[in-house]
Amino acid sequence: MQVNENPNKVPVELNRTSLYLGLLSVFVLGILFSSYFFN
């Protein structure tokens, strides 16, 4: 069961990483837009 659980955890981590990357990119885009508005 443990051997089957390991491969299952890998895609979940990848999905989490992609989600975090998406949030980070949105945050960066927001900062860029705010800087444009301030300028």
Swiss-Prot record:
Q: How does it sit in the membrane?
A: Single-pass membrane protein
Residue ranges of the TM segments:
18-38
Instruction: Provide the alphabetized UniProt keywords.
Output: Membrane, Photosynthesis, Photosystem II, Reaction center, Thylakoid, Transmembrane, Transmembrane helix
Location in the cell: Cellular thylakoid membrane
GO BP annotations listed:
photosynthesis
Give the main localization category: membrane
* Superkingdom, taxonomy of origin: Bacteria
Xref: InterPro entries: PSII_PsbL, PSII_PsbL_sf
CC annotations in GO:
photosystem II reaction center; plasma membrane-derived thylakoid membrane
What single Pfam family name could you report for this chain, choosing any that match? PsbL
What this chain does, per the record? Answer: One of the components of the core complex of photosystem II (PSII). PSII is a light-driven water:plastoquinone oxidoreductase that uses light energy to abstract electrons from H(2)O, generating O(2) and a proton gradient subsequently used for ATP formation. It consists of a core antenna complex that captures photons, and an electron transfer chain that converts photonic excitation into a charge separation. This subunit is found at the monomer-monomer interface and is required for correct PSII assembly and/or dimerization.
Could you tell me which HAMAP family the record lists for this protein?
Answer: PSII_PsbL
Q: Which family does it belong to?
A: Belongs to the PsbL family.
Under the subunit heading, UniProt states: PSII is composed of 1 copy each of membrane proteins PsbA, PsbB, PsbC, PsbD, PsbE, PsbF, PsbH, PsbI, PsbJ, PsbK, PsbL, PsbM, PsbT, PsbX, PsbY, Psb30/Ycf12, peripheral proteins PsbO, CyanoQ (PsbQ), PsbU, PsbV and a large number of cofactors. It forms dimeric complexes.
Q: What is this protein called?
A: Photosystem II reaction center protein L
User: Could you tell me which species this protein originates from?
Assistant: Prochlorococcus marinus (strain MIT 9301)
- Which gene is the coding source of this polypeptide chain? psbL
